[in-house]
């Protein structure tokens, strides 16, 4: 049996889901080891993809200091030993880590108790946990720095892809938890977009859902506003342009959907990794990147109206393999 571990945010969990589905389709039994914090339970507590699911009281370490960091590290070690019981009970031979603080206990447990550890790094810049564990893993997967981009993406994003020809609808994405800056930007652009007959679809996160809806209503702008959706590909398919953060899973899903995107990387992401996630698209003239600090909405709006969405959409069609999960699982099962 194989264990998949990691999560915290939608980006990590999307990879866990894609790899688990591929394993299940091959008749493999899979368990999930995640955290009580973050979105792990929301994604998988009632999912039938995994044979068994475990959610630990794990916490991030990177942003903690002093005694709080020490306690967090001790908690990871304690939970790693708890994983030993899970490994034994389910005869776990391999652990696949998809990153995030949720992955720490089972990943360290795999190293300590000599289980095969496989790591998928989703970002262009390695996270600290993956950097520490890389020398001890059986195989390290990254979709950056390779000739083919084999990021594990749900096939639904490919199935709903289309080439865009005309800007009729714009999608604002703030990630699985929403983003205040993206929300504010969307509202600031709303009247200009309305005046050019451009429809708005806006994922704003749960915290600002009612406020965002109220502000659109006050302006007299009809917009599709929602907090979170398990069918985000439906909204992508309806859209001709996206404005989004540059979290890895969202970025690759947008590529798979051939949806032209203007990325505004989260400026406080570790090592500015969101900028580097999207840089290869910028270098290939397949995306625009704006820095959040000092962004001029008038310049951005001009770019929105002048962007050649057809050529970008055409260029995105074949940039990522639809068989990313298959390619990765093939390599894991051969080890």
UniProtKB/Swiss-Prot annotation:
Superkingdom of this protein's organism: Bacteria
In its UniProt record, a GO molecular function of this protein is:
undecaprenyldiphospho-muramoylpentapeptide beta-N-acetylglucosaminyltransferase activity
Q: Where in the cell is it found?
A: Cell inner membrane
Q: Which GO terms describe its cellular component?
A: plasma membrane
Residues binding UDP-N-acetyl-alpha-D-glucosamine: 9-11, 123, 176, 274
The UniProt catalytic activity note for this protein reads: di-trans,octa-cis-undecaprenyl diphospho-N-acetyl-alpha-D-muramoyl-L-alanyl-D-glutamyl-meso-2,6-diaminopimeloyl-D-alanyl-D-alanine + UDP-N-acetyl-alpha-D-glucosamine = di-trans,octa-cis-undecaprenyl diphospho-[N-acetyl-alpha-D-glucosaminyl-(1->4)]-N-acetyl-alpha-D-muramoyl-L-alanyl-D-glutamyl-meso-2,6-diaminopimeloyl-D-alanyl-D-alanine + UDP + H(+)
Annotated keywords: Cell cycle, Cell division, Cell inner membrane, Cell membrane, Cell shape, Cell wall biogenesis/degradation, Glycosyltransferase, Membrane, Peptidoglycan synthesis, Transferase
UniProt key word Oxidoreductase: no
Q: Which residues form the signal peptide?
A: none
Q: What class of enzyme is it?
A: transferase
Which Enzyme Commission number(s) are on file for it?
2.4.1.227
Q: Main localisation, per the record?
A: membrane
Bilayer topology reads: Peripheral membrane protein
The keyword Oxidoreductase is annotated on this UniProt entry: no
Known HAMAP family for this protein?
A: MurG (MF_00033)
Q: Which family does it belong to?
A: Belongs to the glycosyltransferase 28 family. MurG subfamily.
Summarize the protein's role.
Answer: Cell wall formation. Catalyzes the transfer of a GlcNAc subunit on undecaprenyl-pyrophosphoryl-MurNAc-pentapeptide (lipid intermediate I) to form undecaprenyl-pyrophosphoryl-MurNAc-(pentapeptide)GlcNAc (lipid intermediate II).
Task: Provide the protein name.
Answer: UDP-N-acetylglucosamine--N-acetylmuramyl-(pentapeptide) pyrophosphoryl-undecaprenol N-acetylglucosamine transferase
Native organism taxonomy:
Bacteria, Pseudomonadati, Campylobacterota, Epsilonproteobacteria, Campylobacterales
């Amino acid at each position: 049996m194989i264990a998949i571990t990691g999560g915290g945010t939608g980006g990590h969990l999307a990879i866990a889901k894609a790899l688990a589905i591929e394993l299940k389709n091959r008749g493999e039994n899979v368990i999930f080891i995640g955290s009580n914090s973050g979105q792990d339970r929301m994604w998988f507590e009632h999912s039938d993809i995994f044979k068994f699911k475990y959610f630990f009281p794990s916490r991030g370490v990177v942003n903690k200091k002093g005694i709080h960091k020490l306690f967090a590290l001790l908690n990871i070690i304690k939970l790693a030993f708890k994983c030993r019981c899970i490994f034994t009970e389910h005869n776990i031979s391999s652990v696949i880590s998809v990153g995030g603080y949720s992955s720490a206990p089972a990943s360290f447990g795999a190293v300590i108790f000599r289980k095969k550890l496989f790591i998928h790094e989703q970002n262009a810049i390695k996270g600290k946990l993956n950097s520490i564990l890389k020398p001890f893993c059986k195989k390290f997967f990254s979709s950056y720095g390779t000739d083919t981009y084999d990021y594990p993406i749900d096939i639904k994003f490919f199935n709903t892809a289309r080439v865009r020809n005309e800007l009729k609808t714009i999608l604002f994405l703030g990630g699985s938890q929403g983003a205040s800056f993206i929300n504010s930007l969307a509202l600031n652009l709303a009247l200009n977009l309305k005046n050019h007959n451009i429809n708005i679809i806006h994922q704003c996160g749960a915290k600002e859902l009612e406020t965002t809806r109220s502000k659109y209503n006050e302006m007299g702008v009809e917009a599709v506003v929602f907090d979170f959706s398990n069918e985000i590909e439906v909204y992508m398919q309806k859209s001709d342009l996206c404005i989004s953060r540059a979290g890895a899973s969202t970025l690759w899903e947008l590529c798979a959907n051939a949806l032209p995107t203007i990325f505004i990387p989260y400026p406080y992401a570790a090592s500015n990794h969101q900028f580097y996630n999207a840089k290869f698209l910028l270098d290939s003239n397949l995306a625009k990147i704006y820095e959040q600090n000092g962004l001029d909405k008038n310049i951005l709006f001009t770019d929105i109206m002048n962007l050649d969405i057809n050529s970008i959409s055409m260029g995105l069609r074949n940039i990522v393999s639809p068989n990313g999960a298959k390619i990765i699982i093939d390599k894991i099962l051969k080890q």
